[in-house]
């Protein structure tokens, strides 16, 4: 089941997160491969949290309200992905990051991108929207 919630965070809190992540002082890091390392695509990432190392960003606290609202019982990873505008859509392979848990995708900007699921459902990128689904 795919659950979509628009206007997920209070406007002021969302704008604060958006401003931080789109600002000059926010660090992004190159990652080879969007889905798999050899897929010939790339993206920029910011890792907020990984269980192996714990909080991995000085900005981890911006996600407190978000985690409470999604009622997360355990966090496996908080990661921001930044992809770039391309002349044509660059589809990636379907994949599962984890099994037996839920994934939440939170959209920071509105653009012509989307998240596509194996059943054909497409979720448009709309700022302050969250898409929650079973990871497997």
Give the positions of each predicted feature:
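Non-heme Fe(II)/2-oxoglutarate
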Residues: 1-74
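A broad, low-specificity signal marking well-ordered, structured residues that form hydrophobic/aromatic
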Residues: 2-3, 73, 78, 102, ...
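Short loop segments at secondary-structure junctions
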Residues: 8, 108-112, 136
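Short catalytic/ligand-binding loop motif for oxyanion handling, primarily in non-cytosolic enzymes
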Residues: 12-15, 37-39, 86-92, 114
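Internal catalytic-core helix/loop-beta-alpha segment
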Residues: 74-99
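A short beta-strand-loop-beta hairpin characteristic of the jelly-roll/cupin
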Residues: 88-91, 99-101, 107-126
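Conserved metal-binding segment of the jelly-roll/cupin
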Residues: 123-136
């Amino acid at each position: 089941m795919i659950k979509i919630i628009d206007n997920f965070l209070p406007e002021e809190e969302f704008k604060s997160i958006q401003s931080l992540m789109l600002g000059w002082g926010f660090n992004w890091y190159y990652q080879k491969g969007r889905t798999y390392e050899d897929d010939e695509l790339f993206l920029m990432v910011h890792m907020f949290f990984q269980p192996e190392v714990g909080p991995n960003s000085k900005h981890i606290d911006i996600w407190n309200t978000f985690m409470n609202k999604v009622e997360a019982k355990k966090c496996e990873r908080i990661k921001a992905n930044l992809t770039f505008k391309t002349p044509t859509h660059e589809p990636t392979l379907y994949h599962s990051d984890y099994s037996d848990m839920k994934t939440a995708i939170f959209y920071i900007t509105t653009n012509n991108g989307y998240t596509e699921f194996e059943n054909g459902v497409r979720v448009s990128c709309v700022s302050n929207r969250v898409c929650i689904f079973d990871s497997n």
